[in-house]
Regions:
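N- or domain-start disorder-to-order transition segments that initiate the globular core
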Residues: 1-6
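Non-heme Fe(II)/2-oxoglutarate
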Residues: 7-106
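Catalytic core of non-heme Fe(II) oxygenases with the double-stranded beta-helix
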Residues: 80-177
């Protein structure tokens, strides 16, 4: 997994961040994407969030809902590895001690650890023509007394074209630009 230097990370505006094309090995990303399509055939082109297939996807979506107990939630995260081994490999790689050490070196933040609950994390998808509003993710964990220090977004869109839109944008604090 590619990283940038600490100097480059902290020189980004309006907030320290990194954007790395081909961050992960492309063959791993392609295999993960293909697994998601095999498990959820309408992954690439679905338009109806209420379809039966779409509802079934929630079975593997590792986001803790308020009506789910911890065992079900953790089981679902673990199920991802058995159903989609390459996706599971990415999850494992990005939560590994080695990766956390690299993030720590790049950011200068010591004692990083991952959220074993994946609260607010996991696999997210925007439908064709969909939109995700500009927002700020929570800072305080919804269950534990932890502060979020780093977000990581990994896009799995092979052959993505800039004219499609959907670019990652960093806005200023008052969301005016």
């Amino acid at each position: 997994y590619e990283m940038v230097s600490r100097e480059e990370y902290y020189s980004q505006q309006p907030f320290p961040h990194m954007v790395v094309d081909n961050f992960a090995p492309i063959d791993l990303i392609n295999r993960a994407y293909k697994e998601l399509i095999e498990v959820w055939p309408d992954w690439a082109y679905a338009t109806d969030p209420n379809s039966e297939r779409e509802q079934n996807k929630k079975e593997f979506y590792p986001y803790r809902n308020s009506n789910e107990d911890e065992k079900i939630y953790i089981k679902r995260v673990n199920d991802m590895e058995s159903v989609c081994p390459h996706v599971g490999q990415i999850f494992n790689d990005l939560t590994s001690k080695d990766f956390l050490e690299k993030l720590g070196e790049m950011t200068g933040i010591t004692n990083l650890f991952t959220d074993p609950y994946f609260a607010g994390g996991g696999i997210h998808r925007i439908y064709t023509g969909g939109h995700l509003n500009v927002h700020t993710d929570y800072m305080l964990h919804p269950v534990e007394p932890w502060y979020r220090r780093i977000n990581l977004l990994l896009y799995l869109t092979p052959d993505w074209q800039e004219e499609w839109g959907g670019n990652f944008e960093m806005w200023n604090e008052d969301t005016t630009e």
